[in-house]
Amino acid sequence: MKRPARPVLKLSLQFADASHRAQLPRHKVLRWIRAALDVPAEITVRIVGTDEGRALNRDYRQKDYATNVLTFDYEAEPVVVADLILCAPVVEREARDEGRSLEAHYAHLLVHGTLHAQGHDHEIEAEAQAMEARETEVLRALGYADPYA
């Protein structure tokens, strides 16, 4: 039986600090995002430092701190168009504090952001449970542990 074709993904990968490039190889980012996609997408992933992460979170969410991932979704159909902003120092700290590998944490946050870009949310408990279940399903298929366990 033939596997269904994966949705087309156009990816732009940007690093505010080139030192983060080695931690996040393009082929892995492509794999993680594609695994979470249900529709074609044009996604920019930007890895930022604390100052840029904090400024974006403050300006767009009125929260004056750097957060792990921000999703800016611009279009949902027929092609998802979105920016995923990950704050490297926050991601690194969380991975260390939670005893997870940095790779697994980046995979989780990129899957999480990709689901947001497709309309998933976690503001309401039922939606949060559905989104977490989908994240876990995708991450397990990629060979990672349940991030919520």
Curated annotation (Swiss-Prot):
Cellular component, GO annotation: cytoplasm
Cofactor(s) listed in the protein's UniProt record: Zn(2+)
Statement: the UniProt record of this protein carries the keyword ATP-binding: no
EC number(s) from the headed UniProt entry: 3.1.-.-
Keyword Zinc: yes
Function text: Single strand-specific metallo-endoribonuclease involved in late-stage 70S ribosome quality control and in maturation of the 3' terminus of the 16S rRNA.
Protein name: Endoribonuclease YbeY
Organism (species): Methylibium petroleiphilum (strain ATCC BAA-1232 / LMG 22953 / PM1)
Chain's gene name: ybeY
